[in-house]
Amino acid sequence: MGASENLGQGPPPPHSRKRARELVLGLQDEICNELESLDGGQSFRTDSWERPEGGGGRSKVMREGRVFEQGGVNFSEVHGEELPPSILNQRPEAKGHPWFATGTSMVLHPRNPYVPTIHLNYRYFEAGPVWWFGGGADLTPFYPYLEDARHFHRVHKQACDTVGPELHKVFKPWCDEYFYLKHRGETRGVGGIFYDYQDGSGVLYKGQNSEGPAAQVSRELGPHPKSWEQLFELAKACGKAFLPAYVPIVEKRQEQAYGDRERQFQLYRRGRYAEFNLVWDRGTIFGLQTNGRTESILMSLPPLARWEYGYVAPADSREALLTDLFTRPQNWFEDATLEERCRPHQAVD
């Protein structure tokens, strides 16, 4: 691989900002068009906005759809002179450089409790010679179906493998680690992939838990330098994995009959989703610190949620299986006990 491919931490290639912008903007359009067809009841309302300090974005929101109770797909392209603390804490060498960030983020809250909530985010950042890619997607079911979790992970592993077979080995446990509610002692859902600060240097894990599973796997694998082009292709492959990873699950579950019990549990679990986004999510913190558009930053929150003091799922119930198994990191492909635990609760198709 020649130096022209920009392996490692060299400067970004020409037109890097334009290409990153076009990638995430294209993902927003492609995904929204497919979701409108899937919903068949509502369209996305588009709001374009400008950021006084520099840049702007485009938010697309669907409300009261046939399939999606609420969904938001946001694109932003922002720039400025002064970096926020959330970035400088991670990359102090970026201090003093004008910065640029672009990305697309999405959260869909389906109406039917048997259809999982999903989140996606892919982004690119530059500040002088400093650049990196970040992103990921994760699935939050309210009722447990083993094959849905396996399908979602399988499609994203295949996307990562197009760039390097080592990537998913780190990005899967990193996702489990990132989408973790420390105050609840549980993950937000069944995970997926998550990566950040991928600057080509070869260190795959750049999170905050140096003793966690993702960090351990990253150390065992050693450095795997990547070019800007390879990391661009990773974002492209993973972004395009969204529809084949999620649409078949929606199509399979959206017509399943449900009652008030399922709806109430869905709303209760949505409360956990809101807790994570408001307390732990770095994207929310970055947006608020940089005077982003509040409506777009908080559009990931569910339209309805509820809290119940001291709630415990009934013993040996589907709700208990969700809480005990599907909010804990799992080896979805190699753990033979998962089927044994799921089958008595109709969680195996």
UniProtKB/Swiss-Prot annotation:
Keyword entries, A-Z: Chlorophyll biosynthesis, Cytoplasm, Heme biosynthesis, Metal-binding, Oxidoreductase, Porphyrin biosynthesis
Active site: 119 (proton donor)
Localization of this protein: Cytoplasm
Record-linked Pfam families: Coprogen_oxidas
Cofactor dependency: a divalent metal cation
Site positions per UniProt: Important for dimerization: 183
Catalytic function, reaction form: coproporphyrinogen III + O2 + 2 H(+) = protoporphyrinogen IX + 2 CO2 + 2 H2O
GO BP terms in the entry: chlorophyll biosynthetic process; protoporphyrinogen IX biosynthetic process
Keyword Oxidoreductase in record: yes
Binding locations of a divalent metal cation: 109, 119, 153, 183
Disordered: annotated span: 1-21, 37-60
Pathway terms, separated by semicolons: Porphyrin-containing compound metabolism; protoporphyrin-IX biosynthesis; protoporphyrinogen-IX from coproporphyrinogen-III (O2 route): step 1/1
Region (Important for dimerization): 273-308
The protein's role, per its UniProt record: Involved in the heme and chlorophyll biosynthesis. Catalyzes the aerobic oxidative decarboxylation of propionate groups of rings A and B of coproporphyrinogen-III to yield the vinyl groups in protoporphyrinogen-IX.
Protein's name according to its UniProt entry: Oxygen-dependent coproporphyrinogen-III oxidase
